[in-house]
């Protein structure tokens, strides 16, 4: 049985070492999606992931997929795309539209874990300066992008979407370059996918990840508004 977290007592998570092996990383249920709960969770390497009709479920998988910003892998074809000038990359231009797009089912009739409760919670974190979006715009339309959380010198990627070829990859590459400029040391990708591996993601043990967060989030920078044109420098 996984522990039930009482939201009346404030955020108090069990150690991530107690997370289940099957399903990988399930740690606890209950709690709340308020800013204090989310900040406490992310600082400990924990994130919410659940479907409509389920209680809030908290996860911390082992191993953990991460990207170190200086290890971004840009393929020849992606670099060619990045050098074109048919798109515009914006930061925090329309966060709500990005999270809504990420919530759209990938297949007709499919579900989504980005429930209305999740959307409302992260829009609130965006208003507080913790959650950010990176957006690829083509011909005046939102073509792809991603959103995530920034705490200290760690960025936690949540979800991405693409309506045009390579639109999410364009946003991801510009995000990583922007994180390097801000001296971020780690981009958490949560779960392993081939898509992330192709961009330089690699797995590290959960205990190593949690220790790194202890260092990177100790320097808790004030939440910041990212400049909308902060990722628009030409790609070389």
Go through each PLM region and give its residues:
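N-acyltransferase acceptor-side catalytic subdomain
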Residues: 1-236
């Amino acid at each position: 049985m996984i522990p039930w977290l009482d939201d009346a007592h404030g955020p108090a998570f069990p150690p991530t070492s107690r997370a289940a092996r099957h399903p990988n990383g399930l740690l606890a249920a209950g709690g709340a999606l308020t800013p204090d709960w989310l900040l406490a969770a992310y600082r400990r390497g924990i994130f919410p992931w659940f479907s409509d009709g389920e209680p809030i479920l908290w996860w911390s998988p082992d191993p953990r997929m991460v990207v170190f910003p200086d290890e971004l892998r840009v393929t020849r074809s992606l670099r060619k795309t990045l050098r074109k000038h048919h798109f515009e990359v914006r930061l925090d231009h329309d966060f709500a539209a990005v999270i809504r797009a990420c919530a759209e089912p990938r297949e007709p009739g499919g579900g989504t874990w980005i429930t209305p409760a999740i959307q409302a919670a992260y829009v609130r974190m965006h208003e507080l300066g913790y959650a950010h979006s990176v957006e690829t715009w083509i011909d005046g339309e939102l073509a792809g992008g991603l959103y995530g959380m920034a705490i200290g010198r760690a960025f936690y990627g949540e979800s991405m979407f693409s309506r045009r070829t390579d639109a999410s990859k364009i946003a991801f590459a510009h995000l990583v370059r922007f994180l390097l400029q801000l001296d971020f040391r780690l981009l958490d990708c949560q779960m392993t996918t081939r898509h992330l591996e192709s961009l330089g993601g690699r797995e590290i043990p959960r205990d190593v990840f949690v220790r790194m967060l202890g260092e990177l989030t100790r320097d808790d920078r004030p939440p910041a508004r990212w400049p909308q044109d902060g990722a628009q420098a030409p790609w070389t």
